[in-house]
Curated annotation (Swiss-Prot):
Changing K67A: No effect on DNA binding. This is Single-stranded DNA-binding protein WHY2, mitochondrial. Pfam families: Whirly. It comes from the Eukaryota. It comes from Solanum tuberosum (Potato). One of its GO terms (molecular function) is DNA binding.
Length: 238
């Protein structure tokens, strides 16, 4: 496994690297939501106060294509501290997918981004897909209320006819705002393989199960709060 020093590159070094979307309006590197370092190779050097900037990792996996861009990164779970001194899962983590549209050659509008949070089960569906399989997921924040159907999100993953990759599409219908947004990002077999492998690695972490195998005492005992701050952007904030 990579050493911590290789994982925590200074942010200014990242910004000097050229990306396919380097001219992007609101580049992913400048606007990506911070992911609190939680993987076992990083956590031991993370500052206990999650409100500080030390210990955050900027590491989305991004794919820039002609009509839209897509990035994926884990959002770690949050925990409540128990009076006994242990911690209990408060909210499970997710793999957050972010889509934003193209507004010109190598230009993308970050302000019009849409989010889709993959649960652990949905991640399992994605990583188990074969070359001819397809998956579709539906999210509705008001599904069990009288407002059901006002805002709907659907994510579909379908294979190319020639087997060279997949089309990942997000549709967001907001009847309150009278909007209907759709993004489609073609990904190659190699790009999908990266996502599948990364998601498989991240799965136990977003479930919080890594706490069973790696529980450094300082990460719990020094926490000043009963609730670990939730450093994730909620899917339905948009």
């Amino acid at each position: 496994m990579l050493k911590v020093s290789r994982l925590l590159h200074p942010r200014n070094q990242l910004l000097h690297k050229k990306l396919p979307g380097e001219c992007v309006k609101g580049s992913i590197w400048q606007h990506a939501i911070n992911t609190f370092a939680g993987f076992s190779t990083v956590r031991q050097n993370v500052v206990a106060d999650a409100g500080k900037r030390e210990g955050r990792v900027f590491a989305p996996y991004s794919v820039f294509k002609g009509k839209a861009a897509l990035s994926a990164e884990p959002r770690l779970p949050t925990f409540n501290r128990l009076d006994s001194g242990g911690v209990k899962l408060n909210r499970r983590g997710v793999i957050m997918l972010t889509f934003w549209p193209s507004v010109g050659e190598r230009k993308y509008d970050w302000e019009k981004r849409q989010l889709f949070a993959l649960s652990a089960t949905e991640v399992g569906s994605l990583i188990s897909m074969g070359t001819r399989d397809s998956s579709e997921f539906f999210h509705d924040p008001s599904m069990l209320s009288s407002n059901a159907g006002q805002v709907r999100k659907s994510l579909s993953i379908k294979p190319n006819a020639d087997g060279s990759g997949y089309f990942i599409s997000l549709s967001v219908v907001n009847n309150n705002l009278k909007t209907n947004d759709r993004f489609t990002v073609p990904v190659t077999t190699a790009e999908f393989a990266v996502m599948r492998t990364a998601f498989s690695f991240a799965l136990p972490h977003i479930m919080g199960w890594d706490r069973f195998t790696n529980r450094p005492s300082e990460s719990i005992s020094q926490s000043p709060s009963k609730v670990v701050p939730q450093l994730m952007e909620a899917e339905w904030d948009r």
